[in-house]
Amino acid sequence: MDQDALISKEDSEVEREASGGRESLSDVIGFLDAVLSSEPTDIGGDRSWLHNTINTLQRPGSTHRAKGEGEGEVSTSSTQDNRSGEESRVSGGTSEPEAEAHARNVDKQNIHWATGRGASTDSVPQDLGNGRDSGILEDPPNEGGYPRSGAEDENREMAANPDKRGEDQAEGLPEEIRRSAPLPDEGEGRADNNGRGVESGSPHSARVTGVLVIPSPELEEAVLQRNKRRPANSGSRSLTPVVVPSTRSPPPDHDNSTRSPPRKPPTTQDEHTNPRNTPAVRIKDRRPPTGTRSAPDRPTDGYPTHPGPETDATKKGA
């Protein structure tokens, strides 16, 4: 019994769900039929009144007729239809004061900047909202009446006459150096630099081209005296030759090509017998006076011969 009751309840729930699904499907199908049965001309009807300008005025009681989707014609007042136009008009009215306030702020900033720099407000023109390029003009008019500088006038003349520079170069004239100091006087510069600059430093001047200034004798003497008074540098090496005491310079008429090599001084007998303990003693050169004959045992160079054992034996035998 209980199982039969449960089965009957389940069957009733399934039937309800199926009936609910059928009702929802029937509603959707009916809605689609209503949409498809409507004429396409009604969907794309005349809506030109939505694009009317804001300034156009309509009668307060004028109404517009519109068709809904299967609901028939509905009358709407002009105030409701033009609500979007009023909103746009309000937004436009609020945007205009904001633009004016922004322009006033920009003008105040320009005036403050110009007064701080000591210039007039006309020197900084501004274009707001016209679509043109804003900024400083290339050649602003001289409305204040201030005199222009010479460099600007020269630049304007050269810009107006571009062939002038080419003519000057073709004639061989030097190009002028603008904003440069004038050349000093020749006599004044000669007295100031003490003879160090005898030529002008500017090669572009046509007055000194090919001219050499010859210094005077007085100027040369002054330069020589100044160089003599200048102290010698202690760090420089001396140019005097260093004389070695052990060497002798030859006489001026002596020929170096015929000079004989230096000879070794003779040694005594004591040096041969005991050269380590006995110091070497050099015999003085005893040259005979001029006009006398030299001894047979004395050589021509004045040095004595070595007294060996043979000479001693001959002397004893004699």
Swiss-Prot record:
Keywords: Phosphoprotein. The modification Phosphoserine is found at S249, S257, S260. It comes from the Viruses. The keyword Phosphoprotein applies. Residues 7-20, 99-110, 150-168 have a biased composition (Basic and acidic residues). Residues 50-61 have a biased composition (Polar residues). Residues 1-24, 38-318 are annotated as: Disordered. The P/V/C gene has two overlapping open reading frames. One encodes the P/V/W proteins and the other the C/Y proteins. This is Protein W.
